[in-house]
Amino acid sequence: TMAMQLAKIAQSSGREVWAAYGWIYLFAFLVGFSTTIAEPSLIAVAHKAEEASSRAVSSLGLRISVAVGVAIGITIGTFRIVTGTPLYIYILAGYVVVAVQTLFAPRMIIPLAYDSGGVTTSTVTVPLVTALGLGLASNVPGRSPALDGFGLIAFASLFPIISVLAYAQIVQWRVKRRNRRI
């Protein structure tokens, strides 16, 4: 697979272990973004969210923020596989960020943000992301596919919550800023 070929290239580069995998991080980001933006369930939910919010939530803005969240999550998950860092550290830290963001996010968006993590892990994203994790763990020296290859889906579910809450907070901030000028 592509992940295996990129892992072999990284191993032969002679740089710091984590830094040698730059192409794999880019590949992981692109896989995460492209599979999510094409996810049929996300497209449907984004359109319904736009309708239900009387267009306060942009369908495209929601899809892009979820896709960026998945892409960042999968990239960080790929870094975790390469470095061998325990999964729970990232998951606990991520949920602390979610809890803090929830305190400051617009109330209307919180349920949608929490659901966005589940919506993204569907028919398009899961098979490709799972294959990426298993392929990478199989080809990084010292990693076990059984121990290190799984877990990317957890990142793909967690980080969209963070990105959608961030998107809502940015939109809220911009609206408040614009209203102060008027």
Spans of model-derived segments:
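C-terminal membrane-solvent junction of multi-pass transporters and transport-like membrane proteins
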Residues: L103-A131
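Hydrophobic transmembrane alpha-helices of multi-pass solute/ion transporters
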Residues: T1-G22, G149
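Hydrophobic cores of alpha-helical transmembrane segments in multi-pass inner/ER membrane proteins
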Residues: F29-G32, P127-L134, S157-V164
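Juxtamembrane and boundary regions of transmembrane helices in multi-pass small-molecule transporters
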Residues: I37, G77-G94, V98-A113, L147-I182
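Juxtamembrane helix-boundary/capping and inter-helix hinge elements in multi-pass membrane proteins
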Residues: S12, H47-S59, I109, G118-T121, ...
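Hydrophobic alpha-helical transmembrane segments in multi-pass integral membrane proteins
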Residues: T75, L128-R143
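Helix-loop-helix junctions within the multi-pass membrane cores of secondary transporters/permeases
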Residues: Y21-T102
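Short helix-terminus and kink motifs of transmembrane alpha helices
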Residues: M4, P40-H47, V164, W173
